[in-house]
Amino acid sequence: YSYLAFTQLRQMDVAIALKPMKILEVMEKVGNVPTTITCAVKGRYARADLGRWAQRYGIGFNPSDMRANDGEACSRAVLSASTPQDAADITLALYQAIWSEGKTLANSADVVAAVSAHGIDASGVVARIDSPATVAKLKANTDEAAERGVFGSPTTFVGVAMFFGNDRLDFVREELARLEEAA
């Protein structure tokens, strides 16, 4: 659902501060059980639901085996970006590789290859993806997410207001409009 939400957030013409995190660790910290993983019936439903949302948004949907992907390496790649725009471009490239192109990104080398395949200069990613500073930033983001009450992904903050889920984007739009009117 994060892939779906991200494609729509990019169209909202607002600054997006991406904060990659280790979602399973966040869920564990706050006592949330990932039921789409632990309940096979719900997992099958979610797969069909994701396909419906992708069709509605007009985006590709050919997911790889999620359990085979290195989510931490993907998160570290985004954190390796030099600018917020680079982070957004890397995020989209990785989401498309995994969710639309069916590619398995099992390690840092696969992640770098996916970034490069989308026409993005991956030299910064190569230099920083496995650095101690990037690993520490991912841990800090994970801790911050749990402290802010995040329990799943996608979670979007507009100011201090938190919205969870791809299906809450209308509320995100409304909050953005409310803040714009108040300014």
Where on the chain are the PLM-derived regions?
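Structural alpha/beta surface segment adjacent to cysteine/selenocysteine redox centers
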Residues: 1-101
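C-terminal cap of thioredoxin/glutaredoxin-like
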Residues: 1-19, 93-183
